[in-house]
Amino acid sequence: MGYLKNRNFLSLMDFTPQDINYMLDLAKKLKEDKRNGLEEQYLKKKNIALIFEKDSTRTRCSFEVAAHDQGAHAVYIGSTGSQISKKESIKDTARVLGRMFDAIEYRGYGQEVVEILAEHSNVPVWNGLTDEEHPTQVIANFMTLKEKFNKPLNEIKFVYCGDARNNVSNALMIGAAKMGMDFRIAAPKSLFPSSELVKKCMDIAELTGGKITLSDEVDEAVFGADVLYTDVWVSMGEDREVWKERLKMLKPYQINMEMISKTKNPNVKFMHCLPAFHDFSTDAAKEIYDEFNEIPFEVTDEVFESDYSLAFDEAENRLHSIKAIMVATLGDI
């Protein structure tokens, strides 16, 4: 039986550094095997439910391609394609799907939803994103770091810039604490993560040799950084009345060439989970600018399109890292 067989993947809080390294090593192997035409199928005849209450490009494609590569059959259940939370409770949905499928992926709203699915389905459940966490993204991020940096994760100085209350920032902080990293947040104080989560991560970091630092001073936070990471400043499902104030508040935290230079590290890298606002080629960016007369770019196009950027390496690794999570928890390996 596999090392993590039948485990849920809900939060990196549930895993040890050894568990995370196992998934990262497996992701590397699966990527190499696919490229060399040597990939073995560990998920043959498995049926997988993909519940998407929130739309996605990278997460959906990664799960579907990974399932196909591994010989599994994936069924996509979109926000209009089920009775979840409308005519049927999460608990009842879990009990139904658990009798039809070998595993369930959920991308949607509250963390409690994915926890209820895990409790009542009796099959492995994978968190594709909730409002609170995005753990599959972090495995892809760490996989990319291991590929691109000639040093272990616990020697990497990683800075998250911008709105640090979101699911990506939360999951990164948890993952960094687990792996003993120097993790810093550069954000307005009003956009720091919850004090409860920060305390938990600091306690973990104390045991792993890591360090968690929060600062509203950009120069202080980014000095010596190996990685500058950001995410969008506004989300399309939010109350638009808060956008104008937030866009103004986050201007000093935009990743641009000036911030790159402030790191004093010529080998610094930029990362982003995507999608990104870096130019006016999307309707959403134009709409925000037209309505608020504020540029919504969390990163400049100059940085995004530069050699500093690892955004698309990171995006590619969503596939291989998600495949590793699936194989580790469900596969006959």
UniProtKB/Swiss-Prot annotation:
Location in the cell: Cytoplasm
Signal peptide start-end: none
Pathway assignment: Amino-acid biosynthesis; L-arginine biosynthesis; L-arginine from L-ornithine and carbamoyl phosphate: step 1/3
Record: residues binding L-ornithine: N167, D231, S235, M236
Annotated GO biological process: arginine biosynthetic process via ornithine; citrulline biosynthetic process; L-arginine biosynthetic process
Keyword set, alphabetical order: Amino-acid biosynthesis, Arginine biosynthesis, Cytoplasm, Transferase
Catalytic activity: carbamoyl phosphate + L-ornithine = L-citrulline + phosphate + H(+)
Gene3D superfamilies found in the cross-reference section: Aspartate/ornithine carbamoyltransferase (3.40.50.1370)
Gene Ontology terms for molecular function: amino acid binding; ornithine carbamoyltransferase activity
GO terms under cellular component: cytoplasm
Location, primary (coarse class): cytoplasm
Residues at which carbamoyl phosphate binds: S56, T57, R58, T59, Q83, R107, H134, P135, T136, Q137, C273, L274, R318
EC number: 2.1.3.3
Function summary: Reversibly catalyzes the transfer of the carbamoyl group from carbamoyl phosphate (CP) to the N(epsilon) atom of ornithine (ORN) to produce L-citrulline.
NCBIfam families assigned to the protein according to its UniProt record, in alphabetical order: orni_carb_tr, PRK00779.1, PRK04284.1
Alphabetized HAMAP family for the sequence: OTCase
Family (UniProt): Belongs to the aspartate/ornithine carbamoyltransferase superfamily. OTCase family.
PANTHER family: ORNITHINE CARBAMOYLTRANSFERASE (PTHR45753:SF2), ORNITHINE CARBAMOYLTRANSFERASE, MITOCHONDRIAL (PTHR45753)
Protein name: Ornithine carbamoyltransferase
Organism: Clostridium acetobutylicum (strain ATCC 824 / DSM 792 / JCM 1419 / IAM 19013 / LMG 5710 / NBRC 13948 / NRRL B-527 / VKM B-1787 / 2291 / W)
